[in-house]
């Protein structure tokens, strides 16, 4: 529950920052949407090339009689530096979020996944972080398509279990120390705010 409070505080800080920020964007990762993981994020421009964002995902699908679980929630906090054109006259709102970008992020995630056989449950948050690279392409005056990948680490503990009748039988507990891809995004980003932004 503590992570929920952290995300709420960050969201409030992002909302407060929009008054001083050049622009503000709401976004969703289409890859998670396709995987039936609803998600939403917010990104705030801090000056002309830096942004900070918070993303949250949550899914809670289950079918006890068929032993199907697709559950999890968590999110990312990310700081980015954009290297795109920051002086676009055609799309002034999206200019702070366009072009190549590098970033650093931290993440927290918990899940319970089982599809009729062995299940995997992380009932406590696993944490990690990494670095990312991406490219954001303006589609219209307010809409961008952002592609990004991240490499980093994730630590945590998870349990393996098997369904037997109406019970779930614990099999083993494992520590996860993962290094590799920890983030992938094809994000639709909708920019809000007034044209011209802060000077």
Give the residues covered by each predicted segment.
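Hydrophobic, lipid-facing positions within transmembrane beta-strands of outer-membrane proteins
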Residues: 24, 36-40, 56, 73-77, ...
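Sec/Tat signal peptide C-region and signal peptidase I cleavage site
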Residues: 17-21
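Solvent-exposed loop/turn segments connecting transmembrane beta-strands
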Residues: 25-41, 58-59, 63-70
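Outer-membrane beta-barrel "beta-signal"
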Residues: 74-84, 178-199
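Gram-negative (and chloroplast) outer-membrane scaffold detector with strong preference
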Residues: 46-143
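Outer-membrane beta-barrel pore domains and translocons
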Residues: 31-33, 57-59, 105-109, 150-154, ...
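Bacterial N-terminal signal peptides
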Residues: 7-15
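Extracytoplasmic loops and strand-loop junctions of Gram-negative outer membrane beta-barrel proteins
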Residues: 23-25, 114-118, 167-172
């Amino acid at each position: 529950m503590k992570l929920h409070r952290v995300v709420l505080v960050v969201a409030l800080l992002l909302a407060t920052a929009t008054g001083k920020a050049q622009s503000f964007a709401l976004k969703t990762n289409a890859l998670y949407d396709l995987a039936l993981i609803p998600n939403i994020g917010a990104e705030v421009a801090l000056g002309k090339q830096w942004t900070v964002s918070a993303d949250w995902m949550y899914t809670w699908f289950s079918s006890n009689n068929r032993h199907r679980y697709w559950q999890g929630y968590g999110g990312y906090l990310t700081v980015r530096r954009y290297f795109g054109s920051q002086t676009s006259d055609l799309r002034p709102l999206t200019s702070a979020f366009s072009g190549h970008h590098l970033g650093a992020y931290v993440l927290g995630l918990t899940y319970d996944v089982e599809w009729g056989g062995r299940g995997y449950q992380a009932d406590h948050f696993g944490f990690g972080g990494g670095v990312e690279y991406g490219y954001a392409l303006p589609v219209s005056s307010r809409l961008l398509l952002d592609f990004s990948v991240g490499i980093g680490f994730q630590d945590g503990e998870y349990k393996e279990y098997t369904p037997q009748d109406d019970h779930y039988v614990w099999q083993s507990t494992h520590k996860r120390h993962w290094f590799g891809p920890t983030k992938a995004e094809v994000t639709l980003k909708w920019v809000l705010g007034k044209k011209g932004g802060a000077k």
